[in-house]
Amino acid sequence: MWPVLIRERHDEDLPVCVDILRAVHEQASYPINWPTDPARWLTPEAALGIWVAVDAEQVVGHVILTAAGPAAEVERLFVDPKATGQGIGRQLLQHCVTTAAALDRDLSLEVVDNRGAAVHLYRRAGWLETGRTPIDWGGEHASELIRFTAP
């Protein structure tokens, strides 16, 4: 696929992002527990940047970079199920890597262990697994968080 446009998320993108998130949740159980207010969940206060991937003027992906003390974390990374397998997730991830480097912040992320495609993406992109933490909120879907740091 040709590179998609990665741009800041606009207010008018939020309903589409919620719709895509719902489709991801229904297909892949992400997030494991559906948020009470998905629009708010997609707009954390600690955000350093919120971006969408756009292809043919359609939002097809989403990612947030949040502050974590002096470091940064990748959060809320998802791609429209109709657009998976085209490298969009990797482009969004790379945008976060580039932005965190420009801000001189170390970068990490956490992913639940049921997200095989996401774990594969992070490993292929050179991210390093740095730990695992048991969780009690994953129900039958997941039992631990896997922590990765950017290369």
Please provide the spans of the model-predicted regions.
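Conserved beta-strand-loop-alpha-helix junction that forms the acyl-donor binding cleft
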Residues: 84, 109-119, 135-142
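Glycine-rich phosphate-binding loop
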Residues: 87
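A secondary-structure capping/hinge motif
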Residues: 129-132
